[in-house]
Amino acid sequence: MRHRKSGRQLNRNSSHRQAMFRNMAGSLVRHEIIKTTLPKAKELRRVVEPLITLAKIDSVANRRLAFARTRDNEIVAKLFNELGPRFASRAGGYTRILKCGFRAGDNAPMAYIELVDRATEPQTEVATAE
């Protein structure tokens, strides 16, 4: 019985899962939107949201904890300089998962995971004929 066992294995051993989510969390912080499979996106949420909560209080201890979890100084800097202040007034729910169909090769359900308040590119207005 698998009572009280949280998280998905995703057909990987624990070190592979840890490395994969460390890399995916870095990509999500860097690009603010990534495309992945739906189960990976749902698990990534459990990794990224605590990092952003940690970044809301800028201290040396919190920066060291964030570095221990991401192993990338560029990501830590963006977390504490941009994302922490941006989400300071939000109590949680920093990410959004949008389903986007199925992968062509194996029909795996795909999804975009993005930060909720990410800066969108300005859309160019199409001139209408009058």
Swiss-Prot record:
Show the Pfam families listed in the entry. Ribosomal_L17 (PF01196)
> What GO annotations for molecular function exist for this entry?
structural constituent of ribosome
Which InterPro entries does the UniProt record give?
Answer: Ribosomal_bL17, Ribosomal_bL17_CS, Ribosomal_bL17_sf
- What keywords sit in the KW lines? Ribonucleoprotein, Ribosomal protein
List, alphabetically, the PROSITE patterns matched: RIBOSOMAL_L17
Give GO terms for biological process.
translation
A cellular component annotation (GO) from this entry: cytosolic large ribosomal subunit
Q: Which family does the UniProt entry place this protein in?
A: Belongs to the bacterial ribosomal protein bL17 family.
The subunit field of the Swiss-Prot or TrEMBL record says: Part of the 50S ribosomal subunit. Contacts protein L32.
* Identification of the protein by name: Large ribosomal subunit protein bL17
